[in-house]
Amino acid sequence: MAKKIPVLHTENTHISIKEGDSFYRNTWRISPDAKPDVFVTNPFVGTKKISFYSESDSLSFIVKPNKKYDFIVLQKGKEPAYTQIDTYQKEKPTLMPKLILKSKKTDNKSQSDTLRFTLGKNSLIYLKGKVNNSDSLDFIFDTGAGISVVTQSLIEAKKVNVKLDGDQKNTGTDGVSMVKKSSGNVFEIGSLLWTNVPLLSIDYKGFPFDMVLGWVAFEDKVVELNYDTNHLIIHNSLPAVDKEYSKLDIKFINGIPYIKCKTIVNGIESEAWFDFDTGSDGTMAVGQKFAAQNALNNTLKVIGKSTSKGSSGKEFTQKYVLMPKVKVGDFELYQVPMSINDQDPEGVENHENIGNVILKRFNAIIDFKNNAVYLKPNKLFYSSFQ
């Protein structure tokens, strides 16, 4: 009798993987055409537990080196993706080992660490830190980044000791590009120490920062952003949340956190998932698809046009309009400048973005452990959008 192949059920295009102690949230894209779609483990000795998680199901294997293990991911109950775990030690691993975050405090009874940040005139969150024992560098905290980044000019000027050891596909707001990557780096920011940090090297010409600290630096943590005190507090578990906060669900799309927001024109509400992006110096942005579907192109007053460049280096044009009303959780904002893509970049499915010109108006508790964010208006709520 043939051995029954295990099956993982999902309704989505991506699933999560836990390899040993490393958890990769919504990282594995299901590929029914691959036959098989192969996941190669990192080298190990003895045995290792590999688990796959969908939104409603899970499947675990105890694996040994130099073996292959087959299973099926059944998408929407009808489309099978034949998948294989490959533990051969000389194969190139599919995923890099996850970074490790530790507190340098010797007595941390509070189970939290507090970092002081500076809010730039561009609305970005700046932290002072080091990479691989470098001199002090300017980091920005970017929840819209699924990996940390070093600016290419720092490496070229030999201001940081970062060894580039491969290539990786990078998806930015302007499209997809191949960039150099580095593994096994060390970050130090305040009382926090990260080891085994993967980095991308991106040519951020003209951008006022040295490093990008992606949200994955705090995976499985709770991050509290207080713009009244300029404190970024890292908790191991959710602190007490007062009733003034509005709770929103987080949905991870291609490894980036999104929240639902509403635009309101002439009493008509349009809702979509927006990239929760503290690394954006803008207000809100929507794609041409969203604009066309919700009749925004010829309805709103155009107040300007611009040409932008994202992390892939490609230029794209936008028009700026005044959105009469925007709803974020239980809170409403009025006459919000918003950009609309003239044409959506290729290779990027989700174009809606809420940047830190808006997000800075809310103190936030971001629960990366349970996929939720809590927002409360702060002293910046009524500040100008300019």
Show which residues each predicted segment covers:
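Pepsin/retropepsin-fold aspartyl endopeptidases
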Residues: 1-386
